UniProtKB/Swiss-Prot annotation:
<dbReference type="InterPro" id="IPR054608">
    <property type="entry name" value="SYY-like_C"/>
</dbReference>
<dbReference type="InterPro" id="IPR024088">
    <property type="entry name" value="Tyr-tRNA-ligase_bac-type"/>
</dbReference>
<dbReference type="GO" id="GO:0005829">
    <property type="term" value="C:cytosol"/>
</dbReference>
<comment type="similarity">
    <text>Belongs to the class-I aminoacyl-tRNA synthetase family. TyrS type 1 subfamily.</text>
</comment>
<dbReference type="InterPro" id="IPR002942">
    <property type="entry name" value="S4_RNA-bd"/>
</dbReference>
<dbReference type="InterPro" id="IPR001412">
    <property type="entry name" value="aa-tRNA-synth_I_CS"/>
</dbReference>
<comment type="function">
    <text>Catalyzes the attachment of tyrosine to tRNA(Tyr) in a two-step reaction: tyrosine is first activated by ATP to form Tyr-AMP and then transferred to the acceptor end of tRNA(Tyr).</text>
</comment>
<feature type="binding site">
    <location>
        <position position="170"/>
    </location>
    <ligand>
        <name>L-tyrosine</name>
    </ligand>
</feature>
<feature type="short sequence motif" description="'KMSKS' region">
    <location>
        <begin position="231"/>
        <end position="235"/>
    </location>
</feature>
<feature type="binding site">
    <location>
        <position position="234"/>
    </location>
    <ligand>
        <name>ATP</name>
    </ligand>
</feature>
<keyword id="KW-0648">Protein biosynthesis</keyword>
<keyword id="KW-0030">Aminoacyl-tRNA synthetase</keyword>
<dbReference type="GO" id="GO:0005524">
    <property type="term" value="F:ATP binding"/>
</dbReference>
<dbReference type="Pfam" id="PF22421">
    <property type="entry name" value="SYY_C-terminal"/>
</dbReference>
<dbReference type="InterPro" id="IPR002305">
    <property type="entry name" value="aa-tRNA-synth_Ic"/>
</dbReference>
<dbReference type="InterPro" id="IPR002307">
    <property type="entry name" value="Tyr-tRNA-ligase"/>
</dbReference>
<feature type="short sequence motif" description="'HIGH' region">
    <location>
        <begin position="41"/>
        <end position="50"/>
    </location>
</feature>
Amino acid sequence: MTNVLIEDLKWRGLIYQQTDEQGIEDLLNKEQVTLYCGADPTADSLHIGHLLPFLTLRRFQEHGHRPIVLIGGGTGMIGDPSGKSEERVLQTEEQVDKNIEGISKQMHNIFEFGTDHGAVLVNNRDWLGQISLISFLRDYGKHVGVNYMLGKDSIQSRLEHGISYTEFTYTILQAIDFGHLNRELNCKIQVGGSDQWGNITSGIELMRRMYGQTDAYGLTIPLVTKSDGKKFGKSESGAVWLDAEKTSPYEFYQFWINQSDEDVIKFLKYFTFLGKEEIDRLEQSKNEAPHLREAQKTLAEEVTKFIHGEDALNDAIRISQALFSGDLKSLSAKELKDGFKDVPQVTLSNDTTNIVEVLIETGISPSKRQAREDVNNGAIYINGERQQDVNYALAPEDKIDGEFTIIRRGKKKYFMVNYQ
């Protein structure tokens, strides 16, 4: 019998590799399955590049299975070589603990806790930290062949430039994790990104060697790619974080709404919980009326609401509409800073107040003649209000919070003027 969840994952394009396709399907049809996905606390927030494996784990929870969310307080002290061309910088224990705290809060936004199939949050330092060096070498290292490890892509790719013994042992530590969760919490499936295949299969192999035949499986999801070849998960400002202090909900919303027609349907399948019928309808809308950008708006709304909540989504939409219409007066200083984070930043002396001189000194207009023309022609806006008086002097109330002024030239060229 085909499993409904597996069918949905296949339709969404979320299955990259499985250790035993039929075995996983039979298991899901037979029982409520406990499965896990992990992340090392390399920062105090996840970014959207981390999101897909955990959203996939959440889909299992939606179908009645129990997710374990593992935060690598132990492995995070070591560093995963997978997908990295050079050695990671080791973090202090204090920094790792701070990162764990931040990521744990975000997991409570992604998963349901406290139900009969509620998520379980674990930290692998709790068991890895109890293993002595002698025990590590005798009880675990004895079962892992060096040739086997050298065959792993994550190791092979680093051999030419060098890899420390610290990172070389990482895959064994992750293998121990899967074995521990399998024995202690009856965890039978590990979910991860495609770069985790080697670590996942190492865990299954270690269990087989230590315990004999073991009911354990692995499933990986594809690397998220964009049609233009650019790296997914980056905006002009850098990584798109789940932490609202690092990436505001407005910036988060804008990232999703700006996805291309070529990518938006794939991302609706990947990152939202909308069903096939609704996504098919949005695909039809994209094909027949692409100018409406209904698919992009839906993607932005669904993901922003899921991560940040309905109030934050409404604020993001309000800011977007105000910036689009030029109604800047309705926004707070923080909202304006968020909204204009990526526009050119120019610095102005507090002594310069005449509008023409302001335009010249900041380089907004290329010459005095052009500056006067811009003002006379109604092309200059101060904080959203048109200014056509060439003798106008910037007043204290034009300085938002006494810090900056937003000047627009023409229809779309915005500048943030900061004072010194």
